[in-house]
């Protein structure tokens, strides 16, 4: 679940929280300004986008371990702000950054979609979501086919070729990363990855022979890599027998610290 997608859900509730409660934070850098927060936000967003591994976003355990100290340092920078006297809109922005960092922390500690949910690796999207980004966890290099106009011009064909290039290495990485035991997520995820293969086949028909050989090769290689992942997922399905839920306590933490909604699981369902 990309933390950038949290913004639309929490702007209103953050404003309510700020108006209704104090915002005291560690006072060491009392001179920290809103400009400093903007600089931190830029650093945070740079960090939140993972490095590449063989041309695809890196979701390996080693990557998260290697960068954890950097993440904790960003958290400390945010916690050090003294925002009590800031205008309310600027305080809200502080909470937005806090929520995004909490979302990242929750994903790497609890949700771990890159390890538990095969659908996380779905890359090709043929339709626009009815939410600002996409529902459910998605990775950082999606191919939004619905944004392209067909027939493709040369510039668009080149851009699509580059976007499709991440699919083979990402499908390979998925087989190493998917160590989770969430059965329902596993079974549903197979369907999503299989659908990607069908969407790529339709794309190949749509572009025909009028595009560059490099684009056709990128489509073919993406289909092969996607099909190989489907076969692997199906072979592993029988051994994935665990629950897919994260538990009430974790849900409550996510609700309160990421979406900034002051409710518990029990309050939501009653």
Where do the model's predicted regions map?
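N-terminal secretory signal peptides that target proteins for export/translocation
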Residues: 1-5
């Amino acid at each position: 679940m990309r933390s950038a997608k949290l913004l639309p859900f929490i702007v209103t509730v953050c404003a309510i929280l700020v108006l209704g409660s104090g915002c005291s934070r560690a006072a060491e850098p009392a001179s920290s300004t809103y400009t400093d927060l903007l600089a931190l936000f830029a650093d945070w967003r740079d960090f939140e986008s993972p490095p590449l591994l063989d041309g695809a976003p890196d979701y390996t355990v080693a990557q998260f371990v290697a960068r954890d100290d950097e993440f904790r340092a960003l958290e400390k920078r945010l916690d050090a702000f003294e925002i009590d006297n800031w205008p309310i809109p600027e305080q809200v922005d502080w909470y937005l950054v806090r929520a995004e960092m909490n979302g990242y922390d929750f994903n790497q500690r609890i949700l771990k979609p890159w390890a538990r949910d095969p659908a996380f690796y779905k890359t090709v999207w043929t339709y626009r979501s009815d939410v600002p980004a996409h529902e459910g966890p998605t990775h950082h290099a999606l191919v939004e086919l619905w944004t392209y106009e067909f027939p493709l011009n040369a510039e668009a064909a080149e851009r699509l070729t580059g976007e499709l290039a991440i699919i083979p290495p990402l499908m390979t990485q998925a087989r190493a990363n998917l160590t989770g035991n969430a059965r329902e997520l596993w079974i549903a995820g197979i369907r999503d990855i299989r659908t990607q293969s069908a969407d790529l086949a339709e794309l190949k028909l749509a572009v025909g022979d009028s595009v560059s050989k490099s684009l056709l090769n990128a489509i073919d290689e993406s289909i092969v890599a996607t099909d190989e992942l489907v076969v692997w997922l199906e072979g592993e399905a029988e051994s994935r027998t665990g629950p897919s839920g994260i538990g009430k306590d974790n849900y409550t933490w996510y609700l309160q610290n990421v979406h900034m909604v002051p409710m518990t699981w029990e309050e939501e369902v009653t």
